[in-house]
């Protein structure tokens, strides 16, 4: 047990409830969902065996229907929504940076450049911050593309507009970091921002790939962040790296040969995470980890459980980016494990 200057006591190893870490509970969780899938699967098999002509069209794949895929604002409200999008993204970034990242505010009147190593165990955050930059720009590009498409832009134009506005917004963030006492301008952050933008553009341009692949963020607030929240101090989830995992997800529901089987409820995840870099008092060492896992496709589950509507579609969209904590890590590789000096 370690106590800081405020008298707050941290448990150095156990940051999650012990029973949640029991692998058998995760096995039971996955088994229940797969079992529940057999009923709709049997119906699909029955349809195939009937006299109804077989179809290989999109609905026959069993992919969830998201109303936001075709949503558009009215002609009356579209100009206002578009103006709010143009202004809201950079202004929101500026306000967030001033409050959480302490941009200048009279403390630093010069621009600093601080490149941070992103490869190797000695990287300040073990590379988790670069994954965070990539995910934030991936999600931002896709959201802004949706906003422009929903306000009247064509598909290709909306992709370009979304990518450019996201780039402007993220670059404002990097310039602001240059005036921060805690960060500084990092060219590697800009590089990983572009990786995220590129991934978002590719998946927006090719819907067939988007139905199979996505980048997701798993997050469960750390004890330090919960402590800050309870004491009304700053709680920046974007830099709470010891509580985050970043994944490239393969959605089995998007594969035609698997979309009418129980496997459509599952995702295959390849993920990366670090522990002990951001909050060293909570861990005995700094570790970098890669894992291969299986998780539930909550987007498909919501579409099957909830009635069609914007509530269901909102949850489906959310789970395309946010990865709930429940997953089954089949294999975990520790890249490095360095005790704190």
Where do the model's predicted regions map?
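Transmembrane beta-strands of outer-membrane beta-barrel proteins
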Residues: 211-215, 264-270, 292
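Primarily interfacial, aromatic-capped hydrophobic alpha-helices that serve as membrane anchors
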Residues: 203-254
């Amino acid at each position: 047990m370690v106590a800081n200057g405020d008298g707050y006591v941290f448990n150095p190893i156990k940051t999650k409830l012990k029973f949640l870490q029991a692998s058998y509970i995760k096995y039971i969780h996955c088994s229940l969902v797969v079992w529940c899938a057999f009923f709709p699967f049997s119906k699909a098999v029955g349809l195939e065996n009937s006299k109804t002509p077989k179809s290989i069209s999109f609905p026959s794949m069993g992919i969830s229907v998201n109303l936001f895929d075709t949503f558009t604002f009215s002609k009356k409200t579209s100009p206002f929504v578009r103006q709010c999008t143009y202004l809201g993204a950079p202004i929101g970034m500026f306000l967030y940076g001033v409050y959480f990242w302490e941009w200048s505010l009279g403390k630093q009147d010069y621009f600093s450049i601080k490149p941070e190593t992103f490869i190797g165990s000695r990287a300040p955050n073990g590379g988790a911050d670069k994954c965070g930059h990539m995910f934030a720009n991936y999600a931002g590009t896709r959201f802004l593309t949706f906003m422009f498409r929903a306000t009247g832009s064509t598909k290709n134009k909306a992709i370009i507009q979304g990518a450019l506005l996201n780039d402007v917004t993220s670059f404002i963030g990097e310039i602001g970091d240059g005036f921060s006492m805690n960060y500084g301008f990092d060219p590697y952050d800009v590089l990983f921002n572009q990786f995220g933008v590129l991934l978002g553009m590719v998946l927006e341009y090719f819907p067939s790939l988007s139905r199979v692949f996505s980048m997701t963020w798993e997050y469960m607030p750390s004890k330090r962040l919960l402590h800050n929240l309870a004491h009304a101090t700053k709680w920046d989830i974007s830099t709470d790296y010891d509580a985050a995992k970043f994944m490239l997800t393969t959605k089995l529901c998007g594969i035609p040969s698997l979309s009418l089987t129980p496997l459509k409820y599952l995702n295959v995840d390849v993920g990366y995470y670090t522990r002990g870099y951001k909050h060293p008092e909570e861990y005995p060492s700094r570790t970098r980890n890669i894992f291969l896992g299986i998780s539930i496709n909550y987007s498909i589950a919501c579409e099957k459980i909830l009635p069609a509507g914007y509530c269901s579609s909102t949850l489906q969209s959310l789970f395309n980016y946010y990865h709930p904590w429940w997953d089954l890590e089949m294999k975990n590789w520790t890249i490095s494990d360095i005790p704190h000096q």
